[in-house]
Amino acid sequence: MLGIREPDIYGRTTYADLCQLIEQHAQKIGAEVELYQSNHEGDLVDKIQKAYGNTDGIVINPGAYTHTSVAILDALKAVAIPAVEVHISEVDKREEFRQISYVRLACFATITGHGVNGYLEAMELIRERYES
């Protein structure tokens, strides 16, 4: 629904546009990326668990699961892969329920309110973590 749902909050960039932007940035910084999107909590947990042992970092926008999913939190903690939480909007300045993030507890950084550029910033943070 990216680009369709509440464009005044999330912008008009589509998911396809976002994927292209991420892939271009990955090529620029010499990173490999695997893009994944699901509306199903269990699928996201499965994907995180499958990343164990073969992934250097996770950039995650858990959407509404940010505020409800102990399962995603536990999956991120279990795999212990450096993770950055990203939100296109500034969730901390929106409704009170959006200010709760379970996922944040398992991430070394959170980027909110930077639009789709937040994903690129998250990639940079993970890269910098491995360079230092």
Where do the model's predicted regions map?
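Short glycine-rich anion-binding loops that position phosphate/pyrophosphate groups of nucleotides
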Residues: 1, 63-66, 89-91
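Glycine-rich phosphate/diphosphate-binding loop of Rossmann-like nucleotide-binding domains
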Residues: 1-29
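Short beta->alpha junction loops
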Residues: 32-42
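Short, glycine-/small-residue-rich phosphate/pyrophosphate-handling segment
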Residues: 34-35, 84, 92-132
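Short acidic active-site motifs
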Residues: 43-47, 68
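Short acidic/histidine-rich motifs immediately flanking catalytic phosphotransfer sites
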Residues: 51-58
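Short Gly/Thr/Asp-enriched flexible loops that form oxyanion-binding sites at enzyme active sites
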Residues: 69-78
